Amino acid sequence: MLYNSTQNAAEVVSAAQAIAQGISKDGGLFVPQEFPKYSAETFNELLKLDYKGRAKKVFADFLSDFTEEEINDCVENAYTKEKFGSDNPAPLAYAKLNGKELNILELWHGPTCAFKDMALQILPHFLTKSLKKTYDGKDAVILVATSGDTGKAALEGFKDVDHTKIIVFYPVDGVSPMQKHQMNTQEGNNVTVCAIKGNFDDAQTGVKKIFTTPEISAKLEANNMLFSSANSINWGRLLPQIVYYISAYCDLVNAGKIAMGDKINVVVPTGNFGNILASYYASIMGLPINKFICASNSNNVLSDFIKTGVYDKNRHFYTTISPSMDILVSSNLERLLYKLAGNNADTTKELMTALKTVGKYEVSDEIKAEIKSKFFGGFCDDEQTKATIKALFDTDKYLCDTHTAVAVNVYEQYVEQTGDTTPSVIASTASPYKFSKAVLEAVSDGTDLPENEFDMVEKLFEVSNAPVPAPLAALKDKKARFSDVTEVNSMPQYVLDALNIK
């Protein structure tokens, strides 16, 4: 299995190279040249396996330059009971709302209480093995732009991993207090955290620019280092996300909720487009998905794109109570466009250049039609998000976070507009306790709220009786290690200083 750049047909690399490098030298993203196709027989075999077994099968089909022993080692070390609380790191929960049964895929049982753990607990294992195969002896410098959850999950995954250093940038006012405290208290001798004076898109653009600046790469090379990424632009981040959609389908069949071969819908709260893209890739492999429901907050660039075929980032940026979706440039959409353009790197490059230069592009009528046939885009604002949290809690005592609530709200819009009652899997991406203030405001009368984040956690527990995840409870007495803030245009120098490179 080889990988191409979405912007340069001539760039062909192995899986290990794609993971180690993170992003193509031309700025494109790596995608597999082909996808394995799973028959009904394959899915029936997957039914009998646990989560680890399903993961091993999927990884073996994409990582052809990894041995079976290497893949087993990665999986067994990543998805442990100690890290995820059970043998199934991605369990389904069931709740009812307005007469509909919701199949909620809880992806937040890992060490940082967000869905990013599903990929970022295994990525360090993928990366260290990839480095040995491709750049043996070099240290990888992991650069991360985060809207909240990726940063902490990457820091936790890479802390004290040999031959790696990790630097995380986050928007100074664009993450929740809990997310900020999680990052700034991070342990490890190879970690650095810095806020930027800007939003997530500024952070992500800054990181991409550093990646593709030859002078900076040359300085790292001279110091026996290379850049890699822990954002979902890295194929090693995206691949593990395919697994949990396949596993959720198998779990629904085993639970008697659907029969093998039945179609499902997938509902995903979407920012950078990686999570929903993973479900799309699973469908290419044979997972029977009827519709991909893309849920946005007030930063509704994606829902507009799905409706019109025009992607336009020239719009107001909202800071919302679902900050992991406060994004106007969805990086992984590039991979979908590449696929829908018939794997045409020239077309993809043209669209991405337009986005970079004028902030917008329009896809062809053929691509518009294909997107409309497979995707539904909707959005809701903060008040609708809170109303959904309250409705779900009042109806079934199920407590969800703000991002999951956006997905539930948009799912309800979809059913109302289409009448489609196909069984649906809703991706739940974070613990409600990561966003205690907003969730507490939703389920209580909103008065007499504590000012301290951890007092809010305790108050939310009193109101809801939903268990507080141990990793979040343990943060209360941790002191901050990091407090740096930098301008966006100072990010390159900050990286060099952090690495002690002159």
Predicted regions and their residues:
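PLP-dependent amino-acid enzyme catalytic core
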Residues: M1-K502
